[in-house]
């Protein structure tokens, strides 16, 4: 998982409340047995004018010119600005996979669905909760100025605007540690590899029958 320390990126405003996980990545794309390739289908039913299916060549599909991520001014955005209750609905880890693979490093909103919020941390996407007033201000700024960028300082837990205004946000120390050092669940386990090997060696000495292979 990629480390997240300080990130500066273009902001794309998604001015909709209660965006659920089926809107983030529609259910038909959950059939895939791979963990990759979901970025092209992020917000599929909003980005395209036709119905998408797994394995389809998205480069030939008709796009919805009115959808925010299809507008040239937001091309390459790495921060998604959203409204309250983002990520509600069914639990699917494919939602943060799609956001990450599209290129988003962070999502800013007044509130998130709990399961989605936790899944973001596990997959390298930083979900940031700000007040509705702060989010309203960022929407106004993003829509008023082309190329609007924010700086996110995870160590300092601040979102910094171009004029230097800093908004503080909360993050659990454990989640912060994992993002700062790029540690997913596997990475966290491997931090204790020496202890695991020592335990395995001791277990074989104490219970050798567990190491016996069946014919």
Swiss-Prot record:
**What's a Pfam family in this record?**
Aconitase_C
Q: What does this protein do?
A: Catalyzes the isomerization between 2-isopropylmalate and 3-isopropylmalate, via the formation of 2-isopropylmaleate.
Which species does the entry assign this protein to? Polynucleobacter asymbioticus (strain DSM 18221 / CIP 109841 / QLW-P1DMWA-1)
Question: Which SUPFAM superfamilies does the entry mention?
Answer: LeuD/IlvD-like
Single GO term (MF): 3-isopropylmalate dehydratase activity
Q: Annotated pathway, please?
A: Amino-acid biosynthesis; L-leucine biosynthesis; L-leucine from 3-methyl-2-oxobutanoate: step 2/4
| GO CC annotation terms, alphabetical | 3-isopropylmalate dehydratase complex
Assembly: Heterodimer of LeuC and LeuD.
Q: What does it catalyze?
A: (2R,3S)-3-isopropylmalate = (2S)-2-isopropylmalate
> What's the superkingdom here?
Bacteria
Task: Identify this protein by name.
Answer: 3-isopropylmalate dehydratase small subunit
Q: What is the lineage of its organism?
A: Bacteria, Pseudomonadati, Pseudomonadota, Betaproteobacteria, Burkholderiales
One GO term of the biological process aspect: L-leucine biosynthetic process
What's the family?
Belongs to the LeuD family. LeuD type 1 subfamily.
The transmembrane residues are none
Key words, A-Z? Amino-acid biosynthesis, Branched-chain amino acid biosynthesis, Leucine biosynthesis, Lyase
What InterPro entries is this protein classified in?
3-IsopropMal_deHydase_ssu, Aconitase/3IPM_dehydase_swvl, AconitaseA/IPMdHydase_ssu_swvl, IPMI_Swivel, LeuD
What Enzyme Commission number(s) does the record list for this chain?
A: 4.2.1.33
């Amino acid at each position: 998982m990629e480390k997240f320390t300080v990130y500066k990126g273009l902001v794309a405003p998604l001015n909709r409340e209660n965006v659920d996980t089926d809107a983030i990545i529609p259910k038909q794309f959950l059939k895939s047995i791979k963990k990759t390739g979901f970025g092209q289908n992020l917000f599929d039913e909003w980005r395209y004018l036709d119905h998408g299916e797994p394995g389809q060549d998205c480069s030939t599909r008709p796009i919805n010119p009115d959808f925010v991520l299809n507008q040239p001014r937001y091309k390459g955005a790495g921060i998604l600005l959203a409204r309250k209750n983002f990520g509600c609905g069914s639990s699917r880890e494919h939602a943060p996979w799609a956001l990450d693979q599209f290129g988003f490093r962070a999502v800013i909103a007044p509130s998130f669905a709990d399961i989605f919020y936790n899944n973001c941390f596990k997959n390298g996407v930083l979900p940031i909760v700000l007040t509705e007033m702060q989010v309203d201000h960022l929407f106004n700024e993003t829509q008023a100025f082309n190329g609007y960028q924010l700086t996110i300082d995870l160590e300092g837990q601040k979102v910094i605007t171009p004029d230097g205004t800093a908004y503080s946000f909360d993050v659990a120390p454990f989640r912060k540690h994992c993002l700062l050092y790029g540690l997913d669940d596997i990475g966290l386990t491997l931090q204790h590899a020496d202890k695991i090997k020592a335990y395995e060696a001791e277990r074989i000495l104490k219970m050798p029958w567990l190491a016996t292979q069946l014919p």
